[in-house]
C-alpha cells in the first residue's frame, strides 16, 4: 500500500508531495514535515556511506519499521524520490525509476511552463502521477 511520496531537488527543496492511503497525520505543517524528512535522509545517507563495511554503490535505499517502509531513490540529476509504503511492498526502486522517467520527465521537465528549481504544480502532472500510482499493484490495501 502506498502512503505518500516526497520529491526533493538536489538542494532539498520540496518539488512535490502527494498522499494516498496515509492513515495518520504528523501534527506538523507539510513544510516542517518535508524539512524533517530531508534532514533525516541527508543524515541517514551520510551515516550509511561512512559506516558501511563495504563500498555502498547505491548507498541508502530503504528502511523498514514494524508499521511502514521508507524507500529512497536518487537519480543522476540529484532529484530524490521518497515513498512510504506498507512493510510488504516490493519492487519500489523500479516503480520510482519509472515514475521519474514516465511521469516526472514527461510532464514536468518537458513542460515549457515549468522553471527548474520550482515545485511541480501542473494539473496534468498531478493527474498523471495519481493515475500512475493508482494503477500500480502497490497502491491498494494489502490482503491479509
Name each region found by the language model.
Residues 1-4, 10-144:
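Acidic, low-complexity cytosolic segments
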Amino acid at each position: 500500500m502506498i502512503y505518500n511520496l516526497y520529491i526533493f531537488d538536489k538542494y532539498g527543496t520540496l518539488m512535490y508531495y502527494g498522499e494516498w492511503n496515509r492513515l495518520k497525520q504528523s501534527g506538523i505543517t507539510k513544510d516542517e514535515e518535508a524539512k524533517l524528512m530531508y534532514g533525516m535522509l541527508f543524515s541517514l545517507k551520510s551515516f550509511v556511506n561512512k559506516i558501511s563495511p563495504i563500498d555502498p554503490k547505491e548507498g541508502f535505499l530503504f528502511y523498514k519499521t514494524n508499521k511502514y517502509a521508507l524507500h529512497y531513490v536518487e537519480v543522476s540529476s540529484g532529484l530524490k524520490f521518497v515513498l512510504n509504503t506498507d512493510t510488504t511492498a516490493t519492487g519500489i526502486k523500479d516503480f520510482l525509476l519509472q515514475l521519474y522517467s514516465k511521469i516526472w520527465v514527461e510532464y514536468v521537465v518537458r513542460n515549457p511552463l515549468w522553471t527548474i528549481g520550482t515545485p511541480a504544480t501542473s494539473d496534468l502532472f498531478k493527474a498523471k502521477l495519481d493515475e500512475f500510482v493508482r494503477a500500480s499493484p502497490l497502491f491498494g490495501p494489502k490482503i491479509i
